[in-house]
């Protein structure tokens, strides 16, 4: 089955795996998805990620993170910019997620960045998703 929005598919797979308390989730590979996984790891939302396989069978394996009592590190994932409705923001208009407790992931001219990095570098871009 063809996926019209690969980023939304990635976020949905992660959301479903977290709700089902899975240890890891496998996602079809793309460069943008690897960058999103990198940001999720840097921000402490996932334990680790790895790219497995080669060629068209390449996959991203994301190890999910839970607290000592099984509480989820990711409580919410929300897709903002979609293929049918793109959302772009200037540097001064980049939204704060839960007053800074969450993170917005943006696609900018300088690569895939968090809202904090984009503000610091003075760039705007397409708001891909919110993570909290």
Curated annotation (Swiss-Prot):
Record-level GO cellular component terms: ribonucleoprotein complex; ribosome
SUPFAM superfamilies (UniProt xref): Ribosomal protein S8
PROSITE patterns: RIBOSOMAL_S8 (PS00053)
Disulfides per UniProt: none
Keyword entries, A-Z: Ribonucleoprotein, Ribosomal protein, RNA-binding, rRNA-binding
InterPro entries (alphabetical): Ribosomal_uS8, Ribosomal_uS8_CS, Ribosomal_uS8_sf
Any one GO molecular-function label of the UniProt entry: structural constituent of ribosome
The UniProt record lists the keyword RNA-binding: yes
Superkingdom of the organism of origin: Bacteria
rRNA-binding found in the keyword field: yes
Gene Ontology BP, a term: translation
UniProt function note: One of the primary rRNA binding proteins, it binds directly to 16S rRNA central domain where it helps coordinate assembly of the platform of the 30S subunit.
Family (UniProt): Belongs to the universal ribosomal protein uS8 family.
Record note on quaternary structure: Part of the 30S ribosomal subunit. Contacts proteins S5 and S12.
Annotated protein name in UniProt: Small ribosomal subunit protein uS8
């Amino acid at each position: 089955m063809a996926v019209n929005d690969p980023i939304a598919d990635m976020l949905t797979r992660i959301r479903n795996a977290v709700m089902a308390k899975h240890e890891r989730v496998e996602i079809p590979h793309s460069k943008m998805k690897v960058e999103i996984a990198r940001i999720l790891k840097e921000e402490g939302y996932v334990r680790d990620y790895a790219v497995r396989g080669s060629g068209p069978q390449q996959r991203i394996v994301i190890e999910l993170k839970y607290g000592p009592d099984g509480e989820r590190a990711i409580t919410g994932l929300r897709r903002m910019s979609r293929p049918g409705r793109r959302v772009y923001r200037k540097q001064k208009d980049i939204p704060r997620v839960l007053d800074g407790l969450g993170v917005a992931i943006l696609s900018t001219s300088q690569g895939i960045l968090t809202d904090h990095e984009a503000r610091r570098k003075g760039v705007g871009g397409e708001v891909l998703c919110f993570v909290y």
